[in-house]
Amino acid sequence: MISFLLLIFLIQLAIYIVNTIGASTVDDLLWILYLRLPSSISKDARKHGELKRDVVQLKREMNATSSQDEFAKWAKLRRRHDKAMEEYEAMNRSMGSRKTSFQYSVKIARWLTLNGPRLFIQFYYTKTPVFDLPPGWFPYPVEWILSFPRAPLGTVSIQVWSSACATAISLTGNVVIAALQKSGQASMRQAQAIPAGKSE
């Protein structure tokens, strides 16, 4: 079985990755993938896209037609455009409500898969130590804090280990992001450098 050390670290890493990427980005990606599945909603999504293209095409044709010189053609295009626009708006409302309910379901599933196991482990194994501290290395107050809230004295509790993992992952992520940004800025400066032969 996987150790508590690694399990809690992986849970905190998954939470950090989802929070860094952004929950809305993950939701949008899952929505796109969901629309690719063979289902009735994917058919509706294709119809929604076709209606949008039809509305745009009719609007272009209507704008290209003079309402004064070719009134009959323009009026016919206008009626077709209005009908297509009405269908598109109804389909857009329907797709919007479906997307909202899908995102709500994804939000619940994300919370249950990320925070649910973390909370379950922290409450169910609250008296179980993650690892033992070497005897005599730390004074009593430090041992008490590290075993907080209910782990045996002289051990590290799951809550403390979870907090330590979250902090370490967050700090490491910030360092990596800062290093990537700095290297990106340096490469941009090199690309924008003025050639030696030119003067300002």
Swiss-Prot record:
Pfam families: CHD5
Gene3D superfamilies in UniProt: Helix hairpin bin
Lumenal compartment residues: 1-4, 132-155
Membrane topology: Multi-pass membrane protein
Record gene name: get1
Organism whose genome encodes this protein: Talaromyces stipitatus (strain ATCC 10500 / CBS 375.48 / QM 6759 / NRRL 1006)
Protein name (database record): Protein get1
Taxonomy, superkingdom: Eukaryota
Principal subcellular localisation of the protein: endoplasmic reticulum
Keywords, comma-separated and alphabetical: Coiled coil, Endoplasmic reticulum, Membrane, Transmembrane, Transmembrane helix, Transport
Residues in compartment: Cytoplasmic: 25-110, 173-200
Any one of the GO CC terms: endoplasmic reticulum membrane
Coiled-coil ranges from the UniProt annotation: 45-97
